[in-house]
């Protein structure tokens, strides 16, 4: 009797487990691709993809992973928290080249994003950052420098971040003060133009 009771209990448990599994519906990915969902800010579609097991670093049918298409902080962090590689270069840039707002930059740095990674032009995130709108980028630049960004890295054209800044910001008179303050910020951390670096390189060689 004890044996029969034990067998019956095992059978009942097995049936209950099978019924439980049958009741749990399989999550299907949405019809929209995870790359498209990330690029248009459809966070629910991105969540559905991740729940369905879509690779957060998927590069098919495009070369870039979803992270480099992400619009906004929420989708960016959702992807990273689910395994997106913050240092994936894709077709020529990393997430730090893509996101410029201080909140995103700080988050990526905390996730050990490479602050000196180069894109397809040899630009570091700092090269790209100083090309943007000055009043938005100052804090982000300071975060990158504090995290170890090379203020005198040379891109493939032999330009430093300061070269990039001076080339891209031929400021209108009303922005002259802001431009001067931003240049002073870079120089305070040792930034130089490639022209200014040449005498230093010559001295080191001698």
Q: What kind of region is each of these model predictions?
A:
Residues 1-4:
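Bacterial N-terminal signal peptides that target proteins for export
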Residues 26-36, 58-71, 89-100, 118-131, ...:
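Ankyrin-repeat boundary/"N-cap" motif
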Residues 33-45:
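Alpha-helical segment of the N-proximal tetratricopeptide repeat
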Residues 13-14:
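C-terminal motif of bacterial Sec signal peptides marking the signal peptidase cleavage site
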Residues 204-206:
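Short, solvent-exposed mixed-charge patches
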Residues 111, 140-141, 145-149, 156-163:
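Alpha-helical protein-protein interaction modules
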Residues 42-50, 72-81, 101-110, 134-146, ...:
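Ankyrin repeat structural motif
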């Amino acid at each position: 009797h004890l044996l029969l009771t034990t067998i019956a209990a095992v059978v009942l448990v097995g049936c209950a487990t099978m019924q439980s599994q049958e009741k749990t519906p399989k999550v299907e990915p949405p019809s929209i691709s995870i790359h498209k969902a990330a690029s248009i800010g459809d966070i629910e579609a991105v969540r559905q993809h991740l729940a369905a097991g879509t690779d957060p670093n998927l590069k098919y049918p495009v070369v870039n992973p979803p992270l480099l298409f992400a619009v906004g902080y929420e989708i960016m962090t959702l992807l990273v928290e689910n395994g997106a590689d913050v240092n994936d270069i894709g077709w020529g840039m990393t997430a730090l080249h893509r996101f410029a707002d201080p909140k995103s930059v700080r988050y990526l740095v905390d996730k050990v994003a490479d602050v000196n990674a180069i894109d397809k032009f040899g630009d570091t995130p700092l090269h790209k950052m100083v090309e943007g709108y000055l009043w938005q980028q100052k804090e982000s630049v300071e975060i990158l420098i504090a995290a170890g960004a090379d203020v005198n890295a040379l891109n493939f054209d032999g330009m430093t971040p300061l070269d990039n800044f001076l080339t891209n910001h031929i400021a209108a008179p009303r922005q002259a003060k802001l431009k001067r303050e931003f240049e002073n910020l870079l120089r305070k951390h040792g930034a130089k133009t490639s022209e200014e670096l040449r005498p230093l390189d010559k001295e080191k060689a001698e």
